UniProtKB/Swiss-Prot annotation:
Source species of the chain: Rhizobium johnstonii (strain DSM 114642 / LMG 32736 / 3841)
Gene that produces this protein: leuS1
Catalyses which reaction(s): tRNA(Leu) + L-leucine + ATP = L-leucyl-tRNA(Leu) + AMP + diphosphate
Cited InterPro entries: aa-tRNA-synth_I_CS, aa-tRNA-synth_Ia, Leu-tRNA-ligase, Leu_tRNA-synth_edit, M/V/L/I-tRNA-synth_anticd-bd, Methionyl/Leucyl_tRNA_Synth, Rossmann-like_a/b/a_fold, tRNAsynth_Ia_anticodon-bd
Biological process according to GO: leucyl-tRNA aminoacylation
Annotated Gene Ontology cellular component terms: cytosol
Residues at which ATP binds: K611
NCBIfam families xref list: leuS_bact (TIGR00396)
Phylogenetic placement of the source organism: Bacteria, Pseudomonadati, Pseudomonadota, Alphaproteobacteria, Hyphomicrobiales
Main location: cytoplasm
Pfam families given in the database record: Anticodon_1, tRNA-synt_1, tRNA-synt_1_2, tRNA-synt_1g
Motif 'HIGH' region boundaries: 40-51
Protein known as: Leucine--tRNA ligase 1
Keyword Transmembrane among record annotations: no
Record flagged with keyword Manganese: no
Subcellular location: Cytoplasm
């Protein structure tokens, strides 16, 4: 009988589920391994083939670790609060809870058909009341510890959504999720004091096995700057302006002071004749998103207040201006401008004809631009002649001695704007009293769930949908007759994802978020796989919450995720005509290198999968046609896991053929054990290949180089196929090595080999270094026929040369941003990639 995944895969999925194979409990006698996927938002669209990429990676690692004797926790759940369900409710009137549960059923079915080894007994959704209870409990702990507070702040307001967005949700003046324009507006909001943990969030990165680029993104977002605060007294006793600068040694070069439009001193210092111009400028600035204001390439605008400050170092009069490129949320919202040594200040001074005073010696032409480097101080009084570092220390000491300044560390990071004007989120569990005070809802009143509503839309004035539920809003303090009002803002979607990894450890616990024994056994997460787009959103927020939970004794580790891996994106071909209209790939044909949808010529591009671009590939269709094992194996074989890769259905066909070859290695035409599988000793060459393959596949799995591991499996399969007599020892090794990647067929082949139980816990094959002694040689990598790289690898690499070349960091960099249209392999010598730019 030929290989038939439509029968094999449901059989083994039913076996695993029926025997609770992947259900796991605490076992102190065994080492633990906790692997976690960034759990999905269950949208109405269901999965596309990009979703299983990371899920397959963690599943391979989990199946491998079980075979290495680890006690493996591999859970799955649903990040189920979110704006799409609320939008759907506004369009259809169907409650978000109904839509969400229906979508979860779809997602769960799709995931289960792919054969992932999840412990489904731990499944939950962030919308489950039992989970909402503990999310709200954590908020109360934040509130009790002074880390949650209300403030009147300038917020990112999205008129299209009638909602406030966090800074991290806005890019280039638009909401990153929808592309809707965003404006600035002042509102009273709930904030979380993440800045109190800025240093610890920075320091904690050092001990984490995370991609360096992602750690750099978090460091840059936190943005630690060492410098000084300096007090500039205003003329006529109008007060003092305190500025923060990272270059206090340039104080003698300050020629004017800049204030953010929101700075509280502006109204007090502006001269009457300038008040109208200043007010108009501030009004215009308030409508600009901060990333626009801070754009280095934007024209530097400003308005003079008529006021002057005094330089404490030399008594110089410095005009005080308002400029929108100064941000109120960074530093003190005031800058001392040193145009000779700061490009932005130089541009501003040049535009407004303000003095430019050189205070650092250099050969740079000050008439052409600012010199931002270091050097010997000039025109700087007692600092003259000192180098920049020495001058920096000297001026800070002088400022301290004279009471006009002090050392200071500042952060780019701002407190987390936490509240949302939405319905489908966790209600914030506080009560507002008549005297203006706020009290936490007693813990015994949790969970506080959102009420039923007929209208889920926020109001244009920013009033949240929950405000419409007057019977719910108007309440009393529990246990009293004191009237109170509930908070009508809700938490952001990020709240539920900040701590879900902990609830998976102990999902049935009704007395605490996570039990002490479970947390101390399973934490930290050993492998966390997800997209790099979460670098300064989910990952930063989760680390913050985890450190708070550490401080209050809920968890025993300071960091939640020890190893992080960012999978790349699976792209797909899209087809678009000159008017921008997209066409389904099935409607497009190629004619002599050109593409047509009927009579319309279209352009082919490689883009992110999107419903709007008609290029989404549904995994259900792939599983139906080729099988789940083929989909899993193909996605691992496409290239390095962290690289972006275009989907090619032809590649799935090739992997399916490999699985058919694997089937024929073990089975004969009548579906029994092939008569050529014998209890025979392997030849020296095959024995050596067997041990080499175990070594390289093991190393590749540990390093998450799954594409090269699959190539090695193909090499071993080719060798076994060529054997007239296939030694059982090598055949069984092949099946066990295949198991993490293609578990259904591996289970079936293992049973054909006469084993009565699942191979889930069969020991991983070992290798003998003495039997390997690999010879190496140099290989060449060409791109469009030109030699671009050379590398050393095994002399008998064969077809695995292609995957080995793709995994070379230099080659990955050379191929980044390009589409590989053809791969030419010359075994034993070279690989040539024929590419075109994206």
């Amino acid at each position: 009988m030929p290989y038939d995944p439509t029968k094999i895969e449901p059989k083994w999925q039913a076996y695993w589920a029926g025997h609770h194979i992947f259900r796991v409990e605490i076992d102190p006698a065994r080492p633990k391994f906790y692997a976690l996927d960034m759990f999905p938002y269950p949208s109405g669209a269901g999965l596309h083939v990009g979703h299983p990429l990371g899920y397959t990676a963690t599943d391979i690692m989990c199946r491998y670790k079980r075979m290495r004797g680890f006690n493996v926790l591999h859970p799955m759940g649903w990040d189920s609060f979110g704006l799409p369900a609320e939008r759907h409710a506004m369009r259809t009137g169907v409650h978000p809870d109904i839509t969400t549960k229906r979508n979860i059923e779809t997602f769960r079915g799709q995931v289960q058909r792919l054969g992932f080894s999840y412990d489904w007994s731990r499944e939950f959704a962030t919308t489950d009341p039992a989970y909402v209870r503990w999310t709200q409990w954590i908020f109360l702990k934040l509130f009790e510890n002074g880390l949650a507070y209300q403030a009147e702040v300038a917020v990112n307001w999205c008129p299209a959504q009638n909602a406030v967005l966090a800074d991290e949700e806005v890019k280039d003046g638009r909401y990153v999720e929808t592309g809707d324009p965003v404006i600035r507006r002042r509102m009273r909001q709930w904030m979380l004091r993440i800045t109190a943990y800025a240093d610890r969030l920075l320091q904690g990165l050092d001990g984490l096995d995370w991609p360096e680029n992602l750690k750099a993104m978090q460091r840059n977002w936190i943005g630690r700057s060492e410098g000084a605060e300096i007090r500039f007294p205003l003329e006529h006793g109008k007060g003092v302006i305190t500025v923060f600068t990272t270059r206090p040694e340039t104080l003698f070069g300050a020629s004017y002071i800049l204030l953010a439009p929101e700075h509280p001193a502006v109204a007090a210092i502006v001269e009457p004749e300038m008040s109208e111009a200043v007010a108009a400028y501030i009004a215009e600035a308030e409508g600009l998103e901060e990333t626009v204001r801070a754009d280095a390439g934007r024209e530097k605008t400003g308005v003079f207040t008529g006021a002057y400050a005094i330089n404490p170092a030399n008594g110089a009069r410095l005009p005080v201006w308002v400029a929108d490129y100064v941000l109120a949320g960074y530093g003190t919202g005031a800058l001392m401008a040193v145009p000779a040594h700061d490009a932005r200040d130089y541009a501003f001074a040049h535009s407004h004809e303000l003095p430019i005073i050189r205070v650092i010696d250099s050969e740079a032409d000050i008439e052409k631009g600012a010199y931002e480097g270091e050097g010997a101080m000039v025109n700087s009084g007692f600092l003259s002649g000192l180098g920049s570092p020495e001058a920096r220390s000297a001026i800070v000491a002088w400022l301290q001695a004279n009471g006009t300044g002090w050392p200071k560390v500042m952060y780019r990071l701002r407190d987390w704007l936490f509240s949302r004007q939405r319905y489908w989120g966790e209600p914030i569990p506080v009560l507002h009293l008549a005297d203006g005070s706020v009290m936490p809802l007693p813990e015994e009143c949790l969970p506080l769930l959102p009420p039923e509503l007929d209208d889920y839309a926020p109001t244009p004035d920013g009033e949240p949908p929950l405000a419409r539920a007057q019977a719910w809003v108007e309440t009393i303090v529990p246990g009293t007759d004191i009237p109170a009002r509930r908070e009508t803002n809700t938490m952001p979607q990020w709240a539920g994802s900040c701590w879900y990894y902990l609830r998976f450890l102990d999902p049935e616990n009704t007395s605490e978020p996570v039990g002490r024994e479970a947390e101390r056994y399973w934490m930290p997460v050993d492998l966390y796989v997800g997209g790099a787009e979460h670098a300064v959103l989910h990952l930063l927020y989760a680390r913050f919450w985890h450190k708070v939970l550490y401080d209050i004794g809920v968890v025993s580790t300071e960091e939640p995720f020890q190893r992080l891996f960012n999978q790349g994106m699976i792209l797909a071909h899209s087809y678009r005509d000159a008017a921008g209209r997209y066409y389904a790939p099935s409607s497009v044909v190629e004619e002599e290198g050109r593409w047509f949808a009927g009579s319309v010529e279209v352009q082919r591009a490689v883009e992110k999968m999107s419903k709007s671009q008609l290029n989404v590939v549904n995994p259900d269709d792939v599983v139906h046609q080729f099988g789940a094992d083929a989909l899993r194996l193909y996605e691992m074989f496409m290239g390095p896991l962290d690289a972006a890769k275009p989907w090619q259905t032809a590649g799935v066909i090739g992997v399916r053929r490999f699985l058919e070859r694997a089937w024929r290695i073990v089975c004969d035409e009548s579906d029994g054990l092939s008569p050529v599988v014998l209890e025979a000793a392997p030849s020296p060459q095959l024995l050596r290949l067997r041990h080499q393959t175990v070594k390289t596949v093991t190393a590749d799995i540990e390093a998450i180089r799954f594409n090269t591991a699959v190539s090695r499996l193909m090499e071993l399969a080719n060798a076994l196929t060529a054997e007239a007599a296939r030694p059982r020892e090598v055949v069984e090794t092949f099946v066990l090595l295949l198991a993490p990647f293609a578990p259904h067929i591996a289970e079936e082949l293992w049973s054909k080999l006469g084993h009565g139980e699942t191979l889930t816990w069969v020991s991983w094959p070992t290798f003998d270094p003495a039997l390997i002694e690999m010879e190496t040689r140099e290989y060449v990598v060409q791109i469009n026929g030109k030699v671009r790289h050379r590398f050393e690898a095994a002399a008998d690499l064969g077809e695995a040369l292609l995957a080995a070349a793709r995994s070379e960091p230099s080659v990955m960099a050379l191929l980044d941003g390009k589409t590989v249209v053809k791969e030419v392999l010359v075994p034993g010598r070279l690989v040539n990639f024929v590419v075109e730019d994206l």
